[in-house]
Design a protein with these regions (language model features):
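An N-terminal assembly and electron-transfer interface module characteristic of large anaerobic redox
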Residues: 1-131
């Protein structure tokens, strides 16, 4: 069974992050209709605890984690250590506009990968080019 969840930080464009999560989730479900997931953006410790409980109650063979915005790696590292299943982090590029990034998702991917690898966890990653 494949599982999915999404991380976000509320200081970024949460509405845009939701749309990225929705589109990516739709693609995943079209490829793996039996995939299950935590369908709320994880933006705080309470959401993180609920997501961890969900996946402990619904074991999966692999997890797709949608890094919809930049976040620190605290939840990702804790989740990976607790669940102990292969993780693929999916990130979303955005065009350079000269202004502030709306998501900064790839930076979150970089930080998450660094944290996991530093702790002897070897994730996979995908940069989802378009919706």
């Amino acid at each position: 069974m494949i599982g999915y969840l999404a991380l976000a930080r509320e200081t970024f464009d949460v509405e845009f992050a939701e749309s990225k999560f929705s589109n990516a989730k739709s693609l995943l479900l079209s490829l793996s209709p039996s995939a299950i997931g935590f369908n709320e953006l994880i933006t705080n410790d309470e959401d993180a605890s609920k997501a961890l409980t969900f996946f402990k109650s619904n074991p999966c063979d692999k997890i797709f984690l949608f890094q919809t915005t930049f976040t620190d790696a605290k939840f990702l590292l804790n989740f990976a250590q607790e669940i102990n299943k292969p993780i693929c982090i999916v990130s979303f590029p955005e065009p350079r506009t000269g202004g502030r990034l709306r998501l900064n998702s790839i930076c979150g991917l970089n930080l998450g990968m660094h944290s996991l690898i530093k702790n002897s966890i070897t994730p996979e990653f995908v940069i989802m080019e378009s919706d």
